[in-house]
Amino acid sequence: MQHPDLKNRDVLLLTELDYGMARSNNRFVARELASRLRMNYAFAPVYIALQKGSGVEKFVDGENKESIHGLALFSRYPMRNIHAISLPNGKDKMKGAEKRLGSLRALIADIDHPIGRFRAVTTHLDAHCSRKHRELQMRIILNHLENLQPIPTLIGGDWNTTTFNSQNAFRAILGYWRRVFMGIRNVAMNHFPYPDRYFERGLFRELEQRGYVYKELNEYGVGTLHYDIKSVEKNTNLRDWVPAWCFPFIFWAAGKVGGRVSARLDWFAGKNICVVDKPKTIHELRDKDGNALSDHDPITLDFVPSAQ
């Protein structure tokens, strides 16, 4: 990693890492990253994929080998008490466009850092579910952490705080019209980048009630996932979940705010964490050939564990 804001990081919390998937050339992505970065790592399988993926991924060459999808923790320092907990699915993963076996998880490890031991948690909350279900998933994680030895803790990952109830297309369509009536510009400016203000308030309230903070640990109000009406890839992926007749309405609404909409889906939350420098959201992260490395923008945080 040569990006100045990413290189030399002591700990990485990554989600959606493949092991033997055609879309990533059947690599064990976590192991390769750990080897190249010279970091320790822990990998937690999440799904066994029964097809190549969704959207544009369905058209890649080759076939899956191991067909595993998961999340990982990386550390330059020893990791201890490594374990994962399962999170309940928000819908039957065999009924969606992308058929999979398994469920999302949270991966947990204690990091023996020279400045002090702390606990790192990487998690991926459900996208195709209700907001209440994401809140439930976070509650399960927090309940588990409360049963562990109390040490400074950082939780991070893709929490899919889209503001939508996406259990099915019907609920998502109803949610679309609700946002239209609230005012397209209002929602795009005041809710998608700030899901904690209203739509996803329950999830963030759960964190705060357990003593976790999040606003000062993130570049608050800056989107990490972007939809552009001109993106063929984004629209191809969206067609797996939304009926074709919806697209003129989606284009119309997005066009009201310049054709591009950004939402904050990726977060850090911490307890007994002291921020050292301003958190950042890194836009337009690309490889040497100009290809986007992820559909989400990475987020960074410099911190030290503080006394409890």
Label the predicted regions.
Residues 1-26, 74, 109, 119-123, ...:
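Active-site beta-strand/loop signature of hydrolases that rely on acidic residues for catalysis
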Residues 12-15, 42-45, 154-158, 213-218:
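Active-site neighborhood of phospho(di)ester-bond hydrolases with catalytic His/Asp-centered motifs
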Residues 1-59, 63-68, 295-298, 304-308:
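N-terminal, active-site-proximal structural segment of metallo-dependent hydrolase catalytic domains
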Residues 66-67, 71-81, 100-124, 275, ...:
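Beta-strand-turn-beta hairpins that frame and shape the catalytic cleft
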Residues 84, 131, 145-154, 161-308:
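Metal-dependent phosphoester-hydrolase catalytic domains
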Residues 19-22, 49-52, 92, 127-131, ...:
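Active-site environment of divalent metal-dependent phosphoester hydrolases
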